Amino acid sequence: MHELTFLVRDKFHLNGYEFISGHSMGGHGALVLGLRNPERFQSITAFAPIVNPSQVPWGIKAFENYLGKNKETWAEWDALELMKRYSGEKIPILIDQGDADPFYKRELEPYRLVEAAKGSNYPLNILIQNGHDHSYYTISTFIEEQLEFHMNELKNNKTKE
């Protein structure tokens, strides 16, 4: 990740204010990278993220393929497990989740992350979007709000300097 960041910063002349976002497993990746690197990101957003991959079929399959069968090593790459024991700077997080998402209860389970956030006193904004599913239509409907969320956080961080 560090090599890619330096490459992007150099190529696009970025100013060091960064946010991260993703959808589904990419949303999980955004949560994990943000929680593991709080000094790097000013905010995190996700659309319908898998929040506890070590406990759901999609995640178990992916973790076994990428991390091996030793489940103890999975915790470092599971957003919920990271949230449970998080003690760093609390980066603002916004999640959009459609209530008509067919994967909502079996694979995504955002309510688990809500409980973990409460347990670690981490402020988490999760918006359950009525009638929306896992599709790109949902993303296109709410992407502007997520970008505004990031923009506001970037402005807030700039004024703290």
Where are these regions (language model features)?
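Non-catalytic cap/lid and distal C-terminal segments of serine-dependent acyl enzymes
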Residues: 1-161
